[in-house]
Amino acid sequence: MSTVTITDLARENVRNLTPYQSARRLGGNGDVWLNANEYPTAVEFQLTQQTLNRYPECQPKAVIENYAQYAGVKPEQVLVSRGADEGIELLIRAFCEPGKDAILYCPPTYGMYSVSAETIGVECRTVPTLENWQLDLQGISDKLDGVKVVYVCSPNNPTGQLINPQDFRTLLELTRGKAIVVADEAYIEFCPQASLVGWLAEYPHLAILRTLSKAFALAGLRCGFTLANEEVINLLMKVIAPYPLSTPVADIAAQALSPQGIVAMRERVAQIIAEREYLIAALKEIPCVEQVFDSETNYILARFKASSAVFKSLWDQGIILRDQNKQPSLSGCLRITVGTREESQRVIDALRAEQV
């Protein structure tokens, strides 16, 4: 008699799944953490809601209203979730039939689009970006049949550049009546003029992902948003968990999105942008650095001579960067989160000491 293991009982696609390799999963024993695009220092909040004996609201009113005001949309166009990652998954669950429909994304880009689709049993199609990391619109057009959701990260993680707005328009026209286009704007606070939020009225099939993890310095809170037209939001509400945000999370999120919270966020953004330019200028003068790419975000992508050796050398010194070598077209590339001036100096000094 054959013995069936617990693993044998699991769905085949789950058995074959490679989980997303988050910065925390990859580990390390560093004291300079520049691998997860987090804000470098903690922001203090006081909990004001003490009614923890009661279940929270499904969509906390103060959070929704504050975010709607900040983003310039109606409250009915906002969904709050456990990070933007949950929004990625909700869109697939709401719009894609497992075994029938597909999602499409354009590597090199964020890894959770594929993980979410594969977990649910939805096909992933990829159309690599062009040499300048812009969209291959012809390639996308050729692969759209059967695609229900298209993910485009702008500014793109890990490359740091914005997608050409005219290409976004072309994509939205190509997909009208066929698929949802998701603009992942996790880093939009670092270049707010590039947001597509003003396009929602024109494109009923546009959805926008946002987060409090980056510029709002709340990666540990796990709070993100989907902005879309009311018809899309209503569908997402059918598949979201009944209580996605705990009471303390909603409490802190509402404070972060208050007028004074927004002012503080914008001050942090200005500080990070200044630090980014300092770090870019320094990296360009370092012998082991072959190329530094322009960035509209809180991280910098650079190509290194002997990048694996450089990555390990810094790792051994407690400086944890993100290796991008396995991403399409990113051979030799490492991604560096913009931290404090002290952290930037640690990186600069360590790289200058590398023998090339």
Curated annotation (Swiss-Prot):
One of its GO terms (molecular function) is histidinol-phosphate transaminase activity. CDD domains: AAT_like (cd00609). InterPro entries: Aminotrans_II_pyridoxalP_BS, Aminotransferase_I/II_large, HisP_aminotrans, PyrdxlP-dep_Trfase, PyrdxlP-dep_Trfase_major, PyrdxlP-dep_Trfase_small. It is an enzyme of class 2 (transferase). Keywords: Amino-acid biosynthesis, Aminotransferase, Histidine biosynthesis, Pyridoxal phosphate, Transferase. Its cofactor is pyridoxal 5'-phosphate. Pathway: Amino-acid biosynthesis; L-histidine biosynthesis; L-histidine from 5-phospho-alpha-D-ribose 1-diphosphate: step 7/9. Disulfide bonds: none annotated. It catalyses: L-histidinol phosphate + 2-oxoglutarate = 3-(imidazol-4-yl)-2-oxopropyl phosphate + L-glutamate. Its EC number is 2.6.1.9. GO terms for biological process: L-histidine biosynthetic process. Belongs to the class-II pyridoxal-phosphate-dependent aminotransferase family. Histidinol-phosphate aminotransferase subfamily. HAMAP family: HisC_aminotrans_2. Homodimer. This is Histidinol-phosphate aminotransferase. It comes from Escherichia coli O45:K1 (strain S88 / ExPEC).
